Every structure is written in C-alpha cells, then in structure tokens.
Regions:
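Intrinsically disordered, low-complexity, mixed-charge
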Residues: 1-79, 84-149
Length: 149
C-alpha cells in the first residue's frame, strides 16, 4: 500500500491542482492574445470587419503578437489548422498570407510598440488582392462583411 487513504487523497489533490494550474496557464495565453488583438482592432478606424482591411489587421496583429511573445512556428501551426494552410478559397488564402506576414513582423520587432506600429504600417501599405509577400492583403470591398470575425 502507498500510504494511508488521506495521504493518497492529498497526493491526488496536489496532482489535480498542478493540472488545473497548467490548464489555467495554457488558457491564459490565448485569452491574452485574443483580448489584446480584439481591443486594438475594435479601436481602429479600418473598414471591412470581415475580409477587409480590419480583418487583415486582426490577422496580421494576432500573428505578430504570437511570434513576438512566443514563436513564429506557433503561427505556422495555427495557420495550418485554422486556415488549412491557405487552401480552399480566397478568404483562407488571404488570412494565411496575412498570418505569415504578421509572424515575420513579430519575429523581427524590437519592441511591443514597434511590432504594433509595423503591423499597422503594413495594413496601410496593403491593398485588395495584393500578390506580394511583403504586403498585407484583403478581398475586394464587395466581399467585405460587417462582422467582428
């Protein structure tokens, strides 16, 4: 036997607490990224909530944030899962393109402020259906939707 019943329960409780702490930590990072990105995006004056410049900004900023605070590799993983690597339609291709560009911006940024300014500058230099790896892109205005996501 491995100790008394109260000792076994105490070990189980400690193990459960560790798992709960790990789960809380793992959940806090996505909440941080989504919270900061949506707060910033909602305050922007960019048009096109979905498929437009605002959507491109959201994707670029989220990816830059993850690359800056974590790793560009994490952006690759999320893009592969959420956007199917950009395959399927123009919207997914646009999102994957902006994720890759945002990750590059975040990976090279020297500061949080610079990273955010560089993403906004990339959006301001972007355009509809741009086929340039160094420019943010979005769909034509007739495809924009007035949504947050």
């Amino acid at each position: 036997m491995r100790g008394t019943a109260p000792e076994r329960w105490a070990r189980r409780l400690r193990r459960l607490r560790r798992w709960l702490a790990l789960a809380a930590l793992a959940g806090s990072y996505p909440a941080f990224v989504l919270g900061t990105v949506y707060a910033t995006t909602l305050r922007s004056d960019l048009p096109g909530g979905r498929h437009g410049p605002k959507d491109a900004y959201r994707h670029g900023l989220a990816s830059a944030t993850v690359a800056y605070t974590g790793s560009p590799r994490w952006v690759e993983w999320v893009t592969a899962v959420m956007e199917d690597g950009g395959r399927g339609d123009a919207a997914r291709a646009m999102d994957a393109h902006n994720n890759r560009l945002g990750a590059r911006i975040g990976a090279r940024a020297g500061s949080w402020t610079q990273m955010r300014a560089d993403v906004l500058a990339a959006v301001q230099a972007g355009g509809a259906m741009v086929e340039d790896d160094d420019r943010i892109t979005w769909l034509p205005p007739e495809r924009w939707q007035d949504r947050l996501y």
